[in-house]
């Protein structure tokens, strides 16, 4: 286990060639403490957690611009609040910009402010360009690296997510604080672009330095998922659980991966036990978007497998309802819709669809609203049609956009819920036009992910209704 580095003061940041415009050593150390917790996906109680650190940071130097950029950026990157609906967040962005204009900042700091402001306006690609400008000159700027990594993920820019880290990876020598975590960040981009061996090697290197690196655990979980290595995946999660279960911002998602292996095996009760024991409690405690998405995705997958999830949708509905008008990420919207449909709440369903349609009609520079008309709305309508028992309509909506769904972001494993939706619709369709779609989709799935028990079950189902001939 790597020893924790001391928190960096003004001079230490200067020595790292990342000077911060503040004279407060306390503010500099709290900036480092917050950044460290963000990278580790863990609220460290000994540091006071992210919220505690940000509160103390603001008190230490109320006009510390990078403190504002990080605090506001973290709220935005969480995708649970929009400047359109959250006046406090809107004010925070404006305050950050105003303070930045009153000080002689470095170019790096000015770019950070511009990137956060641009992200707040929904122009994620432009924000990434600004973070990349920082990384060209300052390859060890972890905040720029992490913010861009997360934004690329939301955009479905898989190659950029990988290459962004490849460009700066050689500069992260072992003496730099948090350097081992860069291995994990790089490994995830490699994994999402199907470089599984390279990704696993890097993730395992990171874990040999820090076994508690929950993001590297997460990369390995993905690799086993994508290769249908169910036994290996389950063993890995069981053996490593004690190391990652306290990473409170990612543990729920790692448990979700564990549950996916169980769903793949057809062990539905065991999967529901993980949901009830770990995933739902995390959602109710944190209200984090990742936990909402995990909950909705898991219940929806189980339902497609014919499993009764009882009243569980009712537990998720209040959070989905609260965010149904946000329209920050189309990926989130699709999952909120699963909850409102699953809980049979037509009012929330209608509100989500109507306000999303409105957003798509005047998108401005918002990348998600620009994508809503051609991809987001057809996907959402397909979920509605599936619920209403119109499988042929689901195919008509999804087949033309299936290769564009990656643009909604999320991981390959997360977006697989939409592949499964398409296959189930094809299995249930009645139109002769669509009679060979299920066979085609299943052959494609089997070629990409051989030895998948879930695919084998679907092929058997197709055979019983004579769709594999």
From Swiss-Prot:
Protein name: Tetratricopeptide repeat protein 38
Entry keywords, A to Z: Acetylation, Phosphoprotein, Repeat, TPR repeat
Protein family per UniProt: Belongs to the TTC38 family.
TPR repeat placement: 108-141, 180-213, 252-285
Residue list for modification Phosphoserine: 5
Coiled-coil segments: none
CDD domains linked to this entry: StaR_like
Modified residues (N-acetylalanine): 2
The keyword 4Fe-4S is annotated on this UniProt entry: no
One GO CC annotation: extracellular exosome
Domain of life per record: Eukaryota
Family annotation (SUPFAM superfamilies): TPR-like
């Amino acid at each position: 286990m790597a020893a924790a580095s001391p928190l960096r003061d003004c001079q230490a940041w200067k020595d790292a060639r990342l000077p911060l415009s503040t004279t407060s050593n306390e503010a500099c150390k709290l900036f480092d403490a917050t950044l460290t917790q963000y990278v580790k996906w863990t609220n460290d109680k000994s540091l006071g957690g992210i919220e505690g650190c940000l509160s103390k940071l603001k008190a230490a130097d109320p006009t510390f611009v990078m403190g504002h950029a990080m605090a506001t950026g973290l709220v935005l990157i969480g995708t649970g609040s929009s400047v359109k609906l959250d006046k406090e967040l809107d004010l925070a962005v404006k305050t950050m910009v105003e303070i930045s204009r009153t000080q002689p900042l470095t170019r790096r700091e000015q770019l950070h402010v511009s990137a956060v402001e641009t992200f707040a306006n929904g122009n994620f690609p432009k924000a990434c360009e600004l973070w990349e400008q920082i990384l060209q000159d300052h390859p060890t700027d972890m905040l720029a690296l992490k913010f861009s990594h997360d934004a690329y993920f939301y955009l479905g820019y898989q190659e950029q997510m990988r290459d962004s880290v490849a460009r700066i990876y050689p500069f992260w020598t072992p003496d730099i604080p948090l350097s081992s975590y860069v291995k994990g960040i790089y490994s995830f981009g490699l994994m999402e672009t199907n470089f599984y061996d390279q990704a696993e090697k890097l993730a395992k290197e990171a874990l040999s330095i820090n076994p508690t690196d929950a993001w590297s655990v997460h990369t390995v979980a993905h690799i086993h998922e994508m290769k249908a290595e169910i036994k290996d995946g389950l063993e890995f999660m069981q053996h490593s659980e004690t190391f990652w279960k306290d990473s409170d911002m990612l543990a729920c998602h790692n448990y979700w991966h564990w549950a996916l292996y169980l769903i793949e095996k057809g062990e539905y009760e065991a999967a529901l036990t993980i949901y009830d024991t770990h995933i739902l409690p995390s959602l109710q405690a944190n209200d984090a978007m990742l936990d909402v998405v995990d909950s909705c995705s898991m219940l929806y997958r189980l339902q497609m497998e014919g499993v009764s999830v009882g009243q569980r949708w009712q537990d998720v509905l209040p959070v989905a309802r609260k965010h149904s008008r946000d329209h920050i990420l189309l990926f989130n919207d699709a999952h909120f819709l699963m909850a409102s449909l699953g809980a049979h709440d037509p009012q929330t369903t209608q509100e989500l669809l109507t306000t999303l349609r409105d957003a798509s009609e005047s998108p401005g520079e918002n990348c998600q609203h620009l994508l809503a008309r051609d991809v987001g709305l057809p996907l959402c309508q397909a979920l509605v049609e599936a619920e209403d028992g119109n499988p042929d309509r689901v195919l008509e909506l999804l087949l033309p956009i299936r290769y564009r769904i990656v643009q909604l972001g999320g991981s390959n494993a997360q977006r697989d819920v939409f592949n499964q939706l398409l296959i189930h619709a094809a299995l249930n369709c009645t139109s002769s036009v669509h009679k060979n779609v299920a066979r085609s989709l299943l052959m494609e799935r089997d070629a990409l992910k051989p030895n998948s028990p879930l695919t084998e079950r679907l092929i058997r189902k197709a055979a019983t209704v004579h769709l594999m001939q």
